[in-house]
Amino acid sequence: MEYRRFDNTIVARIDRGEEVLEQVAAIAQAEQIKLASVQALGAVGEFTVGVFHTAEKQYHANSYAGDFEIVSLTGTINTMDGAFYTHLHMSAGNEKGEVFGGHLNRAVISATCEMVITVIDGRVDRFHSEEIGLNLFQF
């Protein structure tokens, strides 16, 4: 992975074999990001995404392997209990045009990933809501 920062914008290239969440965390830590939005596209060879079941208050994960194009990868970087926290969603399509997506648990790049991180001047933490079962923004 390589990246360059331009004021409040970080442009990154995540390389073949690298895992997306690990690389985003590395950038967040290196740049001391407290709040940011994330956008990306690229190609993945394997990924796991989840769908939150509100009645059960838990995610159900689905894993995929093969040639997939990232149709959309979006989300936020912020903090929870003082630690960096990344919340990303991803959709990826196969050669038949079928698209699979959800909350990103894991994604390994098969060719390249082009990412833009917009750093926001501020800080938003998270807290775990027992009622909802998710880590929500805390202002």
PLM feature spans:
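N-terminal intrinsically disordered, cationic/polar leader segments
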Residues: 1-86, 91-139
